[in-house]
Amino acid sequence: RVDRRQRQMCIRDRDNTPPIKISGNLNLSGISYEMPIASAQVKSAILFASLNAKGKTLITEPLSTRNHTELMFKQLGLDIEMNGNKINFNGQNEFEGIKFKVPGDFSSAAFLIVAALITPDSSILIKDVGLNSTRIALLEVLKSMNANIEINNKRKVGEEDIGDCLLYTSDAADDLL
């Protein structure tokens, strides 16, 4: 899925085997791409390739996917616009590298969250976990089931929402089993 889009942008890989080495090309062009299936990986690969592309890249997703790459580009001050399932990016931006703090991965924490909720007399505190709205559907569902969830210390790090999740055995546990 990724390499086909990059070839469309005139990027060539070395041997077509992992790890893929991408050779530079000074004549990259932006593309307009309507994604047939939602894929954050394909979208991010196109956006990263578009950093050096001349012109505008427009990506249309059938469904919005996670937006960490777009938020990072925004934090870097790059010319990116996000409007629903459409992403517009003007290539050939100059930017300075910055230090990033990467929040804890919510999808990895999901197993621990459910375990704490269904295990009698248990609790867990997950600090500095990412609370990006594109990643926390599980939390919303569990809250609607009256699960014992507290979100503390909510803040932004760069463009990402993070916080500390305190979870403990819930009466909703019977509904989860």
Segments and roles (model prediction):
Residues 1-7, 11, 168-177:
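Single conserved hydrophobic/aromatic residue that forms the stacking wall/gate
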Residues 60-75:
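Aromatic- and glycine-enriched pocket-lining scaffold segments that form the walls
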Residues 109, 114-150:
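A conserved active-site cap/scaffold subdomain adjacent to cofactor or substrate pockets
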Residues 30-37, 55-64, 98-102, 124-129:
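Flexible, glycine/proline-enriched loop segments at strand-loop-helix junctions
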Residues 12-35, 52, 78-106, 117-118, ...:
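Self-splicing inteins and homing endonuclease
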